[in-house]
Amino acid sequence: PWWADDLEMLSKTSVGGIMLAMVESVDHVTETAKRLPNVPIVALVETARGLERITEIASAKGTFRLAFGIGDFRRDTGFGDNPATLAYARSRFTIAAKAAHLPGAIDGPTIGSSSRKLSEATAVSIEFGMTGKICLTPEQCATVNEGLSPSLDEIAWAQEFFAEFERDGGEIRNGSDLPRIARANKILDLAKAYGIHPSMFGDDPDHVSAPSDTYHY
């Protein structure tokens, strides 16, 4: 009921982006975008109705990213919190975001202060191709960022791949080179975004196996 008033107030500020709650239709995003032009909108989908329209919501003008409102979604549907129970919903978020050329979807929050529980929940987000996770407190950010950032093995593989690629002449040799180049670039870009720099590793890392095609790629 306060949507219009909130947007009126926000239009007078230099807000860098908003998370729009209870998105259930394209109109929810487009009408918000009209009132806040050029402001990125994270569409928080929290109901069965919203999930059924998530492809259209992802493609709506103004949608910058999708986010999964797990708590309200479970209340709306009666689902439990087992990862297998929510697998279909999470998959829909990831596929819709990818199809609309959006950044990876943001998973919902984890309630509780246990670092182990939060780490395990973040691993589930990664398994379903999600590249962000809502935090309920500032204290959760470090654990979530650690879980979402590339592993040391992934970074070492990316560095080794490029070193070998250059030693072999730096030319595309077969159809597998392009996806591996893209994957290695993505790993190193993510490492930089999370403050992990190549200088933290040796110039000639030990040989490591290629990481599996998972959340980052």
PLM ranges: what are they?
Residues P1-Y217:
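Expand to "…catalyze enediolate/carbanion chemistry for C-C bond making/breaking, isomerization
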